[in-house]
Regions:
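Hydrophobic positions on the alpha1 helix immediately C-terminal to the Walker A/P-loop
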Residues: 64
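N-terminal chloroplast transit peptides
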Residues: 1-20
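A glycine- and Lys/Arg-enriched "phosphate-lid" helix/loop adjacent to the NTP-binding pocket
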Residues: 140-186
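Walker A (P-loop) phosphate-binding loop of P-loop NTPases
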Residues: 58
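ATP-dependent small-molecule kinase phosphotransfer cores
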Residues: 78-137, 178
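Conserved lysine of the Walker
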Residues: 61
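Hydrophobic anchor at the beta1->P-loop junction of P-loop NTPases
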Residues: 53
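NTP-dependent small-molecule kinase module
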Residues: 26-45, 67, 71, 182-255
Length: 255
């Protein structure tokens, strides 16, 4: 009887790099599409209300702001970029030439202009919370604080370049961040929402993850009946009463 050798197993086909790349791109596209849909849904609930990102230096407000605006279909504005566009000087240059007080005055003027717009994600400077009058403008929208561990923020700032940060010139980065946080913490806590960056690695959570966290927090916030009513309802007759005991406003219409 003739023995038959078993048929050789088929050799597995090798997966080309181009195929792997296509699969990865498809997965990324699906994730981006899902984030886009969720972002637009949150934007619809906000009914035009702008989002202001606040936080200490190194929290990635500019990068996160641009990505969040894209997901929501909003326009992205950056107060530092607007200041540079108007003055033709960087914030660091203005700090050096004018001092912090004058810089904050310029920053407040820019914020007052920006706060008049709707459907915007606004990335703000780290110290914008220091001026009490700025909160009147910040409260025109939803304020989201980005928060991370000091060591993570220091690594980001060092990677970006200390020379861009006028308040870091005189001492170590971590020590300075700690002092700034100590001075500003009570103001940052006034934010409507706080979103953690995470510290799983040196870079913190990826931008897409941070965007998901922001959208989730915004969705939960605006879904509350009281907040939704506040955002949507306009004043009705009788909601606002104007008193004029001295008659300085003149006769009433149709009087």
């Amino acid at each position: 009887m003739r023995a038959f050798a078993p048929a050789p197993c088929a050799r597995p086909r090798s997966v080309s790099r181009s195929t792997t790349r296509r699969v990865a791109l498809a997965a990324a596209a699906d994730a981006t599409s899902a984030q886009y849909l969720r972002g637009r849904a949150v934007a619809d609930k906000l009914v035009g209300t702008s989002v202001f990102l606040i936080g200490i230096m190194g929290t990635g407000k500019s990068t996160v702001g641009a990505a969040l605006a894209k997901a929501m279909g909003y326009k992205h504005l950056d107060t530092d970029e607007l200041i540079q566009g108007v003055t033709k000087k960087t914030p660091a240059e203005l700090f050096a030439e004018l001092g912090e007080s004058e810089f904050r005055a310029i920053e407040s003027l820019i914020l007052a202009e920006v706060a008049a717009y709707k459907n915007c994600v606004v990335s703000t400077g780290g110290g914008i919370v220091c001026e009490r009058t700025n909160w009147m403008h910040l409260h025109n929208g939803v304020t989201v604080r980005l928060h991370g561990e000091n060591e993570l923020l220091a690594k980001r700032v060092l990677a970006d370049g200390v020379e861009k940060r006028p308040l870091l010139a005189s001492e170590g980065v971590v020590a300075r961040i700690e002092k700034l946080l100590e001075a500003r913490e009570s103001m940052y806590k006034q934010a409507d929402l706080t979103v953690p960056l995470g510290s799983r690695d040196d870079a913190g959570a990826p931008v897409d993850v941070v965007i998901d966290r922001i959208l989730e927090a915004l969705d939960a916030r605006v879904s509350e009946d009281a907040v939704q009513s506040k955002l949507k309802n306009e004043p009705k007759d009788g909601d606002i009463t104007v008193t004029d005991p001295r008659g300085e406003l003149g006769p009433k219409p149709n009087a």
